[in-house]
From Swiss-Prot:
Reactions that this protein is recorded to catalyse: uridine(1939) in 23S rRNA + S-adenosyl-L-methionine = 5-methyluridine(1939) in 23S rRNA + S-adenosyl-L-homocysteine + H(+)
Residues where [4Fe-4S] cluster binds: 93, 99, 102, 181
InterPro entries (alphabetical): 23S_rRNA_MeTrfase_RlmD (IPR001566), NA-bd_OB-fold (IPR012340), SAM-dependent_MTases_sf (IPR029063), TRAM_dom (IPR002792), U5_MeTrfase_fam (IPR010280)
Broad class of enzyme this protein falls into: transferase
Function: Catalyzes the formation of 5-methyl-uridine at position 1939 (m5U1939) in 23S rRNA.
Full protein name: 23S rRNA (uracil(1939)-C(5))-methyltransferase RlmD
Family: Belongs to the class I-like SAM-binding methyltransferase superfamily. RNA M5U methyltransferase family. RlmD subfamily.
A Pfam family that the UniProt record links to this protein: tRNA_U5-meth_tr
Length: 465
């Protein structure tokens, strides 16, 4: 009989493994989260696990340390770079690697765009078995200081000397101890330390979890999420800060509907689309594109691809405050904008009036995630569609178009421009439009809306005979 092994000597599956040499891996590609991807080999020379290595780049030979192990893959961080990639560059930000705001600063900008283009192509092929007839040239813009919208977390952390204001640490709920940010506009980056001092002096320093910022053409708005009312001393501090830093404060005591301007009251946010003579007022909680410079180029490309004429009726789905609707109205007979938010629909109508295009526009509030073929038929015939959905994509719209095509009951637009912030849902919807609704994927390309991050914005053109 074998001798029983004492409980204290038995190996636990969670027991720490004795340290040994870090394994070596050849990195073949990047995934959608900007992690290096490699594959181990078995003793028989067969492909083994897929390893996702944070901080590694394609073409590199690295050692790594795994922090999560699954039967078919592991997640790891890079330990040492034995052979660096020619694409590797020195991150500009001191806090890169700790702060979760960026994930690709170590990758050359041209390579970043190339990686995103490949992510788009791979998604179209693997998820929809599609290849675009043409790959559009990428849309480029500023690499730094471009982020005109951000949500900053506020924490009073005694161990770190007081109040922190910034993005979350990478893969953590902790707030990064950051004193500057290279992707925020310089004047906002320079405000991070003064903001810390401001919050330190408020009576509700422990009851203000978040600051949302929105940068307009002439003013920067800061929305303070306040869980308790501010007192007179707080009000005085906010007014003094606003005067010194030329910002406008808004207060949000509860949900988004409770956001109200505090000080000063005689300024307002807007952005412009000079190519089309459009000025777009907005509130700091309205959805607007993060990168205003790229947005201008994106709107121009979308309209050139859609090619509206004075005879066209155009349907703009997920229209928001009218970012595409109003420029389209300059060039079309009629544009109808549909949005799921009543607040944004109201704002879009007001913007159309302010820009003198309300005679060519109509707006409606509808749940586009539940739209059907009958719903689209009820809107009447449209020559062209522009679709700009959130990350969830436009599945119901795509299914509705497929149903109309297959039933033969109802008109279909001859051209669709689809602007996407998620290549996976774009590929899914493209599969429906091509394989079930009879469209051709004429072209697709990336829009580098979020430099130094792994987010992939793209634009695609569909046509139907």
């Amino acid at each position: 009989m074998s001798e029983a092994v004492p409980t204290s000597a038995r190996k636990s599956k969670n027991a720490p493994v004795a340290p040994g040499p870090a394994p070596v891996l050849e990195i073949e590609s990047l995934d959608m989260e900007a992690r290096g991807v490699g594959r181990t080999m078995t003793e028989d020379g067969e492909p083994g696990k897929v390893i996702f290595v944070e901080g590694a780049l394609p073409g590199e030979r690295v050692t790594y340390s795994s922090y999560r192990r699954k039967p078919s893959y592991e997640q790891a961080t890079v330990v040492d770079i034995l052979r660096p990639s020619v694409m590797r560059t020195q991150p500009k930000c001191t806090f890169f690697g700790t702060c979760g705001g960026c994930s690709m600063q170590h990758l050359d900008m041209r390579a970043q765009v190339a990686v995103k283009q490949r992510v788009l192509e791979d998604n179209l092929w693997h998820l929809a078995k599609l290849r675009a007839e043409t790959m559009f040239a990428p849309i480029h813009g500023p690499s730094w200081g471009y982020r005109y919208r951000a949500r900053l977390t506020v924490r009073n952390v005694a161990k770190k000397g007081g109040v922190l204001v910034g993005f979350h640490e990478k893969k953590s709920s902790y707030v990064a101890d950051m004193t500057s940010c290279e992707v925020l506009p310089p004047h906002v980056s320079a405000m991070l330390v003064p903001l810390r001092r401001l919050v330190e002096g408020l009576s509700i320093r422990d009851r203000m979890p978040q600051i949302e910022l929105a940068v307009g053409s002439t003013v920067t708005a800061l929305v303070l999420r306040v869980l308790e009312p501010i007192n007179a001393d707080d009000e005085a501090l906010l007014r003094a800060f606003a005067d010194e830093h030329k910002v406008q404060f808004w207060l949000q005591p509860k949900g988004p509907d409770t956001v109200t301007p505090f000080y000063p009251l005689d300024v307002s946010l807007d952005y412009t689309l000079p190519e089309f003579g459009i000025r777009m007022p907005f509130k700091p909680t309205d959805f607007t594109q993060v990168n205003h410079q790229i947005n201008r180029v994106l709107v121009g490309r979308a309209l050139r691809l859609l090619a509206p004429s004075r005879d066209d009726r155009v349907l703009d789905l997920f229209c928001g405050i009218g970012n595409f609707t109003l420029p389209l109205a300059r060039l079309s007979r009629e544009v109808m904008g549909i949005e799921g938010s009543d607040t944004l629909t109201t704002r879009a109508l007001a913007n159309a009036r302010e820009n003198g295009v309300d005679g060519h526009t109509t707006f409606a509030c509808r749940n586009l995630f539940e739209v059907t073929g009958d719903d689209l038929r009820a809107l009447g015939a449209f020559d062209k569609f522009l679709i700009d959905p959130p990350r969830e994509g436009a599945l119901a719209v795509s299914k509705a178009l497929a149903e109309i095509a297959q039933s033969g009951a109802g008109p279909l637009p001859k051209r669709i421009v689809y602007v996407s912030c998620n290549p996976s849902t774009l590929a899914r919807d493209a599969g429906l439009l091509v394989h079930e609704a009879g469209y051709r994927l004429k072209g697709a390309g990336v829009v580098n809306m979020f430099p130094n991050t792994s987010h992939v914005e793209s634009i695609a053109l569909f046509e139907r005979d």
